Amino acid sequence: MIEQHRTTGNPGSIAHVGGRRTLPATCIIGLGLIGGSIMRDLSAAGLSVYGYNHSRSGARTASREGFDVSDDLSRVLSRASSDHALIVIAVPMHAVEDVLDSIAMYAPNCGVTDVVSVKKPVDELIKARGMQLRYVGGHPMSGTEDSGWGASREGLFTRAAWAITYDYAIECEKAGRRVPDDWVDLFGQVCELARVCGAEAVPVSVDKHDEAVARVSHLPHVLAEALAVVGDRGGVGRVDA
């Protein structure tokens, strides 16, 4: 359902964004299935990547496999600041707010993207902190039922759609302002991140993304729950009006 927005409705400021770009060092916060798989892809491509994992055991396991991982968030973000790294937030939605506050404290100069499956709540947290200029939302449309570093694998995103939001550009253009070059560069970096991971970048607005994901991803779960309720009550004829 996301595919319908590939070539329509994109702001003029990003129409020329294309071709390969050089990724800066990439700092991944949260190394579960998605974050860990991104780390594996970037490492396999020979790019500079390091990260933080809340789970000490997960961080140790990743380190034993040869990846540059720490369980010290402030130290990792301070390093990202020194490197002017691209920060990828790959934690559950309930942890995003604390991560953003830590980024504001330790890496206020870094560009930020995320991989959270719903974009509006993240966008609201970004706006509340005045971070729109250095944020481009993302959502790789791939995954498995497993979680944690042990579930991550190289190639998880091959041929997957990777939604990339452009709402800040829309807001600038509606206000008659030029979209800052720094933001356009960041948008290009996130597109390149998707490409390196084998995915296809799909520009989309926050609202259109969430509408599409609700139809494609969440509706089956709602239907499954409804069917379970029907089954518990003995079939369709027994469901209360």
Q: Where are the regions that the model predicts?
A:
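Hydrophobic Val/Ile/Leu positions in short beta-strands of Rossmann-like dinucleotide-binding domains
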Residues: C27-I28, I89, I164
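Rossmann-like NAD(P)(H) cofactor-binding subdomain of soluble oxidoreductases
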Residues: V99-G150
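NAD(P)+-binding Rossmann beta1-loop-alpha1 motif at the extreme N-terminus of oxidoreductases
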Residues: I2-S82
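Rossmann-like NAD(P)-binding element
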Residues: L73-T113
